């Protein structure tokens, strides 16, 4: 039986870029370029006729640009979309992530005229790998909106107190809790058992949902009773997504010390949207630093950082060399470097060979965090192809840290979390929307 071809539609107004893309994509026998459109309008007209499996779109095009085109595709006939961008101007890299916010899956640098030799071969292999991945991803017809989580407020006599803090647990009400699985997985506790809640691993047909809108996030202090503010008087996240600039909070009160000292998150394909969905739910007074590792094409990291900064209450930045991680910040490794720690707990960069094909590597940083923080670490492994992060998550788990893997139904690509689960490295297996409440709950219970 012949293997089904991967049908690709190119939507690109640059003749040079289109020629290079067609040359690359027509090379392997399992991929077929079924059309090339010069604008978003032309692309929309072609989709019902050519029935692509994957769409490659430019950012800037006449008549209808990439953002409007992506929004229309996701509303009318959702397909996996790869954004092709030159990523030269800072405003362009930021706009690229607006396309991901609208439903595109991944980004890739636009081929340049005159690229030859080793540079062309690397570009070719990376593009073909992305197309093969995107041909099998889960596409959500709408962006999944995360429910705005309520501020944590003092309660009395409800039985919901955790850790003796007098703050309400983020456990859902009984009417919303999952029923126990009739056949729980061996060695794992089923939901509703009163012990650790682990969502069963399964393939589910989920209805169209939204993925990571911009709700207000939680505050970790006691509720003040003022709407729109948390207990510490801090705003509940970035409630207005158009206001990217953060107000400095030099004297913002922080929570009591928690026994967890760091949160680390790894992601690949589909990761920018998943990171936005989690980080936008965490408040500015989040009590531990966050270290994220995201596989992303060269040239797009700063755009990702800038976009997340506009979406989150926390400050997002590239990890500065020789600086100690601090609460209130989200750190990313620089492009092309592993991120680790020196003996004093300060950030160090490494040019060691790629691990699981990646530098920066999730596993390298997870291993460094396991060695440095041990049981004081929380780790989350999100959507992505391959197995990077699985061994590192096992290191954190074996060191006594808390580990969470995104579940299959909410992953764009169920690869990295699946590998971690197969190793027994994930203590929790959860939908993306359930991860922020669990993180907050565990932080509170450790105070």
Predicted regions and their residues:
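Walker A/P-loop phosphate-binding element recognition
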Residues: 165
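Acidic, two-metal ion nucleic-acid-processing modules in DNA metabolism proteins
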Residues: 38
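Conserved acid/base catalytic micro-environments in cytosolic active-site loops
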Residues: 2-9, 15-30, 41-42, 48-49, ...
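Small, basic N-terminal interaction modules of short regulatory proteins
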Residues: 191
């Amino acid at each position: 039986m012949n293997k089904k071809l991967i049908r690709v539609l190119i939507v690109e107004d640059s003749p040079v870029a289109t020629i290079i893309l067609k040359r690359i994509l027509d090379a392997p026998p399992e991929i077929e370029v079924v059309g090339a459109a010069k604008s978003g309008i032309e692309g929309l007209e072609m989709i019902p006729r050519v029935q692509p499996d994957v769409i490659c779109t430019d950012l800037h095009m006449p008549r209808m640009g990439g953002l409007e085109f992506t929004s229309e595709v996701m509303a009318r006939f959702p397909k996996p979309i790869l954004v092709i961008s030159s990523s030269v101007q800072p405003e362009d890299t930021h706009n690229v992530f607006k396309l991901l916010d609208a439903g595109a899956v991944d980004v890739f640098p636009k081929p340049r005229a005159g690229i030859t030799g080793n540079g062309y071969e690397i570009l070719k292999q990376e593009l073909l790998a992305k197309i093969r991945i995107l041909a099998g991803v889960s596409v959500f017809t709408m962006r999944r909106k995360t429910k705005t989580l309520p501020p944590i407020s003092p309660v009395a006599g409800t039985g919901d107190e955790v850790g003796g803090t007098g703050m309400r647990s983020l456990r859902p009400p009984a009417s919303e809790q999952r029923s126990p699985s009739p056949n729980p997985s061996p060695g794992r506790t089923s939901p509703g058992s009163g012990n650790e809640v682990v969502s069963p691993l399964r393939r589910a047909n989920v209805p169209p949902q939204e993925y990571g809108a911009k709700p207000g996030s939680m505050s970790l202090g006691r509720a003040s009773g003022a709407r729109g503010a948390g207990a510490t008087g801090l705003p509940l996240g970035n409630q207005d997504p158009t206001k990217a600039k953060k107000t400095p909070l030099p004297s913002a009160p922080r929570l009591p010390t928690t026994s967890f000292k760091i949160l680390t998150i790894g992601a690949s394909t589909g990761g920018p949207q998943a990171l936005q969905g989690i980080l936008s739910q965490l408040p500015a007074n989040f009590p531990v630093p966050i270290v994220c590792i995201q596989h992303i094409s060269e040239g797009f990291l700063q755009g990702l950082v800038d976009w997340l900064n506009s979406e989150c209450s926390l400050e997002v930045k590239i990890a500065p060399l020789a600086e100690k991680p601090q609460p209130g910040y989200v750190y990313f490794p620089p492009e092309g470097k592993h991120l680790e720690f020196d003996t004093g707990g300060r950030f160090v960069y490494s040019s060691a060979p790629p691990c699981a094909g990646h530098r920066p590597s999730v596993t390298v940083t997870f291993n460094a965090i396991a060695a440095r923080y041990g049981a004081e670490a929380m780790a989350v492994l999100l959507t992505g192809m391959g197995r990077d992060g699985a061994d590192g998550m096992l290191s954190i788990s074996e060191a006594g840290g808390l580990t969470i893997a995104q579940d299959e139904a909410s992953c764009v690509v169920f690869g990295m979390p699946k590998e971690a689960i197969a190793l027994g490295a994930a203590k929790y297996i959860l939908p993306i929307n359930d991860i922020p409440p669990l993180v907050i709950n565990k932080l509170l219970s450790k105070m």
